[in-house]
């Protein structure tokens, strides 16, 4: 049975727009027979890396900080598949996920080697060389807003000796929840997220067609802007009235 470790770094946890895509994806993974553990960074104490390199030169493979990374380290080491879920925050991942990623340094050795023509750190023997999948949501309309996050995850995989298997990306994500509540036709997006979970376990990959459906245009740009800006103006007007 494949072991899947999912990290949802949205501060809104299960009520987030990110969870709208993550949850059916994880359901599909479970339905395909894999074991899934889900953690919310909002519920974890993960301190920033202090850059002391104690985990490299004093106590190899062990971080000196006493926080919730202690319970995550063995899970990160043993996971066949890592699923990192994050909304786009200022063109990147959330701060809480960045803290977690920075604290993964004990999983690699300080020695530098050249792999595929580039300097890398080798993983420790106990660390499984598995896959990584990104799930992300953003408030801007265009799909290219995810480019920096995808690039970051691909670089992370190269450094951590994991295979980047793909990304479930949901642009103009707030529209998905609104349209769902209004009964508008968005079920295909959720079904595609679920299907992506099945494909990941059954085929060790996700089809481009499935990922395109997850990211498809929900409504025209101008209509999206009108709706979002109307909500913000109403909120600001309410402050003025008070």
Name every feature range the model reports, one short phrase each.
Residues 1-112, 158, 165, 187-242:
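N-terminal beta1-alpha1-beta2 submodule of the flavodoxin-like/Rossmannoid cofactor-binding fold
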Residues 59, 118-121, 152, 172, ...:
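Histidine (H) residue identity feature
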Residues 95-96, 109-163:
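Short, glycine-/small-residue-rich phosphate/pyrophosphate-handling segment
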Residues 166-171:
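Beta-strand-loop-alpha "switch" segments that mediate conformational coupling across diverse proteins
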Residues 174-179:
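A short acidic, helix-capping loop that chelates divalent metal ions and anchors anionic groups
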Residues 180-185:
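Short glycine/threonine-rich loop-to-helix capping motif typified by GTGT followed
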């Amino acid at each position: 049975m494949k072991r899947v470790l999912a990290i949802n770094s949205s501060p809104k946890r299960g009520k987030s727009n990110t969870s709208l895509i993550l949850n059916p994806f994880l359901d599909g993974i479970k339905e395909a027979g894999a074991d899934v553990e889900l953690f919310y960074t909002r519920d974890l104490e993960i301190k920033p890396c202090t850059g002391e390199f104690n985990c490299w030169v004093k106590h190899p493979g062990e971080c000196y900080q006493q926080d919730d990374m202690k319970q995550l380290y063995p899970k990160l080491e043993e996971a066949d598949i890592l699923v990192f879920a994050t909304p786009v925050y200022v063109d990147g991942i959330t701060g809480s996920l960045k803290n977690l990623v920075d604290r993964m340094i004990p999983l690699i050795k300080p020695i530098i080697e050249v792999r595929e023509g580039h300097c890398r750190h080798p993983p420790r023997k106990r660390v499984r060389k598995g896959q990584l999948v990104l799930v992300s949501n953003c408030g801007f309309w265009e799909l290219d807003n995810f480019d920096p996050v995808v690039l970051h995850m691909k670089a992370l995989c190269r450094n951590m000796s994991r295979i980047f298997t793909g990304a479930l990306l949901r642009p103009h994500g707030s529209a998905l929840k609104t349209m769902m509540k209004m009964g508008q036709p968005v079920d295909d997006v959720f079904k595609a997220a679920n299907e992506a979970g099945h494909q990941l376990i059954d085929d060790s990959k996700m089809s481009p067609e499935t990922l395109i459906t997850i990211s498809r245009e929900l409504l025209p740009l101008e209509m999206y802007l009108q709706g979002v800006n109307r909500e913000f103006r109403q909120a600001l007007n309410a402050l003025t009235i008070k």
